[in-house]
């Protein structure tokens, strides 16, 4: 029996491109698969000595004989935040985004930081403003390649937009009735934006 798929009638697509057509359960399943595959590809050799590692099925981890430590999947925590000011929200545009798309701000949590501290720092570094009244929204696995996105709402406090991060090309305040192209609902950034609109419409 032929167990291989005939792929002549199929195309490989970037997972980001089909976010809008996936329900949360499907995205979580695909995301888990992608993250585990990335971890397995990048854990074949020990980072301490360079020797080939062994996969220990009972532990679901790789292990090297040089120190017997287990190598588990690594997840990088990131904050992502929607900054609001009444009927306006602050959205930024990364150079990696599709043309015309704007999104919420995000960044990695550094060692020793809480989520809230990382949020305040990232916002200040990226757009130069201060925020207050930080409120947790939700989280989402983000397999590009292995992030956990931790979403928050944050209220504008003070300052003017000053772009100090090379990743951000543009950032503006947008009225809720005049938004640019935004991420799909399947992404946590899209969910943050739509949730705020629903609560303030």
Q: Where on the chain are the PLM-derived regions?
A:
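Active-site-adjacent beta-strand/loop module that shapes the phosphate/pyrophosphate-binding cleft
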Residues: 140-162
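Nudix hydrolase/Nudix homology domain
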Residues: 1-43, 54, 98-102, 164-201
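The catalytic Nudix box helix
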Residues: 103-138, 152, 160
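N-terminal strand-loop-strand
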Residues: 58-103, 130-131, 154
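Nucleotide phosphate-binding site architecture
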Residues: 90, 110, 180
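Acidic, metal-coordinating catalytic segment for phosphate/diphosphate chemistry
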Residues: 30, 35-80
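Short, contiguous, pocket-lining structural segments
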Residues: 37-41, 73, 84, 94-96, ...
